[in-house]
């Protein structure tokens, strides 16, 4: 028996006399449950399915009971320490096929998370084909605590869609269609993404909470393409399987010739005593540890972008100059010209050259960029470098090798072709565009958008469509890495029609992430408040776009949406009434006094995770003795709301309404209960409180 205790995580791994390797336990407390010997064979360290191999038992559409997964035997393990923390590697081998697998568990100092992945090697004499390989597998996720799993287990997911990102919901297993009626079944709870938008319908993460044991297991899949996880049951236990793309679910299939290797998509898996809040805290710390070191996530400069509820992708010199003046006046530090700068009129299906339009900028775009610099701001431009419009003049310089291909045809989506970043000519094209913007135009900020989903993949130089997509995904990440090496101070925002690619393959590289294209500031409140559960608050870019026809409370609500995160200012600032523009400036001035806390703070939710149908929403950030609490009144007749802050129970903290200073709001602190009661004016209103204990 191998017992591992590290950073508050407890792992128990058994190697039997027959050299079968079983992960009996992974949790935030030691293994105390007695697992019956007859059930232990279901506690696989990994699952691996090769083409032509059998499947065992009743398995339905699940990936459990795989072969040669069930045949893999222990071939050794190592336990070392590197700069990140402790590292476990378990080697397994199949004596029949010759396939070898190395299961990696990388711990990170001081955080209750491991990064887990599997490396396959064909050490046999014949080619093999892989249909499924787990990145992490764990059986018995429900074994702790008394009671029936139908009642004690909850799963929290973030549903996603264009303008409706980060819709957090918590379910009992029966609410997702899984009932505990037998000791094993064919049913699974499956979450999957297929395509180049990694968060198109679900974020690649989840939290499983055991109400009886008071512990939670959580995971995030760190990949910018197709991925899969599932919960299934076997040996009267729940099994979690986490992976990248699969043949069954994502059109991925891979041949391995003798001597060839394949590395699975990595996943971060952790466990805590407590619920979602504890998981979010651990993930926040971990996400900061794996992120590319960069000054942007420390400085948190304020961005103005001219798109949302403003120029809507139709910039000109005439329209931009007054906006630049107004943005500088309120304190913005970047000014990003969004879509449309490269073409007159309608431009959607013609993109690809990324040359400025002389009709939009008669004096040249450098005139406008220099004007931005003269106002003390860093200029930025919008790009969409992974696509080329079907009517782009640039197409004359290309051939089919530049693009995703399926069934001999170029893949089209929304009148664009998907570029294939495995092609050196595509890399040269992308490098040339970046070099021109940075070195010739002096751009310091790029909003990198991506408005198509390329689907299941490409057949070019690939064993399957999904194999082609995975290769491209990894090639794009390698290209990003090269750009950040070349231009370490360049800020590149990750945007995919808002938050359609919100994953930590991308966010371990990008310092900032667009959270949504949501155009309604009231609807945005729940998206903003839920975002720090999916990414660090300093990476979470939230639009604030005061409306020309709004009132003071509309401006305040807009600003509160962004003040605990990363401010993406927009709106027709030059046309706002002076006192309403002064509310924008007041908010940004205040933001500059607190932003040094944001990269070191952890999020909390006094009312629980936000509900887009809820009447009140609240988000807090905590750093040491300081807490910042945003509260939004969305709907309903209740004039006040109670915000529990349990760790302050029995204390008498200093509390102030930090923003706005001159508008009505009342509050009361119940010291014995640890509850802040806030009353806000009727309608759609919001306030930001500062609490010092």
Can you say where each PLM-predicted feature lies in the sequence?
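Catalytic domains of carbohydrate-active enzymes, especially glycoside hydrolases
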Residues: 319-341
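Short Pro-Gly-centered flexible turn/kink motifs
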Residues: 79, 254-273, 683-692
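Active-site-adjacent "subsite" loops/lids of carbohydrate-active enzymes
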Residues: 299-301, 310-314, 358, 385-436, ...
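Polysaccharide-binding surfaces and accessory modules of carbohydrate-active proteins
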Residues: 1-233, 657-667
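Active-site and adjacent substrate-binding regions of carbohydrate-active enzymes
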Residues: 118-120, 339, 343, 357, ...
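Active-site-proximal substrate-binding groove within the catalytic cores of carbohydrate-active enzymes
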Residues: 26, 476-668, 675-690
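Hydrophobic faces of well-ordered beta-strands that scaffold small-molecule active sites
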Residues: 302-306, 337, 379-383, 446-448, ...
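Acidic/aromatic-lined carbohydrate-recognition and catalytic surfaces
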Residues: 107, 130, 236, 343-394, ...
